[in-house]
Amino acid sequence: MLSFMNYTHAPLTNWGLKLVDVQDGWTMLDVGCGGGFTIRRLLKLSKDAQVYGIDISEESVVKARKVNADILNKQVFITQGSAEKLPYGDGKFDLVTAVETVYFWPNLPGCLQEVRRVLKPGGKFAILVEVVDSDSKWTNIVEGMTAYTPEQIKTLLDDAGFTQTAIHRKKPTYATIIGVIPRIY
């Protein structure tokens, strides 16, 4: 299943990450790292980067570590955990990504505050989703899923204190919502 997710999420991930303007040397976190594809993609976009991955699923952590075994504990660090309590210090990351995962985060507003906490001033949070209706059939099929529209996600980011929030769309179904942590002057 995780290899299938890596494959099916690749077009969305490749498109969405192009919108971020990833810089060399960044420290990045992929929340809900699944099978590890996004971690690999982030490393290709940023020379001398460090990429952290976190997933609540032990199976996902094992797969992501296997996919990234050649650089594990050098440039890549993967741990099991939740978006509700990220095991990282304040202001650690230049970029946090979430590809097709916010639907499963309990207490999304609280999780967004937690992401905000671990981002550096000026840091970016990119949420990549396939657009679904909030009353979608998926929420009836997939346990623990809450569907959000891009507009709902943008509002939640704004409420959490992100700035410059923007929705980018690629028809028919892809959306990337990016928010920035204000810089401290």
Residue spans for each PLM region:
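Conserved alpha-helix/loop element of class I SAM-dependent methyltransferases that forms part
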Residues: 7-26, 41
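A short glycine-rich, Lys/Arg-flanked "PGG" loop and its adjoining helix->strand segment in the class I
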Residues: 109-121
